[in-house]
A protein has these predicted regions:
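Generic alpha-helical structural element
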Residues: 1, 56, 60, 280-283
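Active-site or pore-adjacent capping/gating segments
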Residues: 1-20
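Composition- and surface-driven signal marking solvent-exposed, interaction-prone regions
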Residues: 18-23, 294-296
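Glycine-/acidic-rich phosphate or pyrophosphate-binding loops and their flanking alpha/beta elements
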Residues: 66-74, 215-230, 239-296
């Protein structure tokens, strides 16, 4: 009876916000402050080589280059960050997006793994529990399905089941979306974004151009650091090397690198042709340049 009386008097969860709090903590002001906090200037110079070589002092670049630059910046900012996956070290990944990171930060922070996504995401959880900031890479979105439960059943549920006593923050990079015409049925081209979207507590970011990618990465890393969130950064393979938008050589899909104190607000949108009144198109990833070309 004493136990029953004690249970009866224990405070109850009465609102959906109270139930959701440990599953999806959100501290917008703290996240904004962390996302816009630049790495130490001296450290950045050491990483990039000189003032002239800082990415914000370079010409406009395409998506793959700016993700690479943003990763270098994150590693300069967070000494506890780690990047690992299949062929990400010396080779720089299938699309060379991680090229140079191994040389700059050595094998203790950038290293290859077995060709096993379950192992990659299991390592990420272990490192996160140790206080590190892991950025595991899943080589293709199709490969994520082999290890989906590591995120759905483990990483994203830890805060909820422990009432926020334990956290495993991470930013999982995943290359995906369609990228080869006439090759849509191939295993590498599996485009099941639903596998990410339907995971409770998971934050999914998907850029379409370089500057947005850099600022989005900063915000995702900040959400992981501040609120312990598990984040997925979905990188459109078809746009990695895309420089032009309407015509060959127009360079309209190459963008300047955003200053290190700039970041995207969680849930913020980029609006194109804001004065148009005939039609509204809401899209992401590959759909953005397609929609812009269609509108023209």
């Amino acid at each position: 009876m004493a136990a029953a009386e004690h249970a009866d008097k224990t405070p109850k969860l009465l609102t959906k916000e109270e139930v959701m709090r440990p599953l999806a903590p959100h501290s917008p002001e703290q996240v904004r402050a962390e996302a816009t906090r630049a790495a130490d200037a001296e450290t950045r110079l050491k990483v990039f080589g000189s003032e002239k070589q800082l990415p914000e002092n370079q010409p406009p670049r395409h998506l793959a280059i700016q993700i690479n630059q943003a990763l270098h910046d994150l590693f300069a900012k967070y000494p506890e960050s780690l990047l690992f996956g299949e062929d990400v070290a010396a080779k720089g990944g299938v699309y060379t997006v991680t090229k140079g990171l191994h040389k700059a930060f050595k094998s203790s922070r950038v290293f290859n793994t077995l060709l096993d996504e379950t192992t990659i995401l299991g390592l990420a959880q272990g490192f996160a529990n140790m206080g590190m900031l892991p950025l595991p890479e899943i080589q293709y979105l199709a490969y994520f399905h082999n290890a989906c439960d590591q995120i759905r059943g483990e990483a994203c549920s830890l805060q909820f089941f422990s009432n926020d006593q334990y956290r495993n923050p991470m930013v999982m990079r995943v290359a995906g979306l369609g990228y080869q015409r006439g090759f849509g049925g191939h295993f590498h081209n599996d485009n099941s974004v639903t596998a990410l979207r339907d995971i409770p507590g998971l934050i999914v970011g998907c850029p379409s151009r370089g500057d947005d990618a850099a600022m989005m990465l900063r915000t995702l890393a900040a959400m992981a650091r501040v609120d312990g969130r598990v984040c997925a950064f979905l990188e459109p393979i078809a746009l990695y090397m895309t420089k032009d938008l309407y015509e060959p050589g127009d360079a309209l899909w190459s963008t300047p690198y955003p200053a290190p104190d700039q970041a995207l607000e969680f849930g913020a949108e980029r609006v194109y042709h804001g004065d148009a009144t005939d039609l509204l198109i809401v899209t992401f990833g590959n759909g953005v340049p397609f929609a812009l070309r269609t509108a023209k």
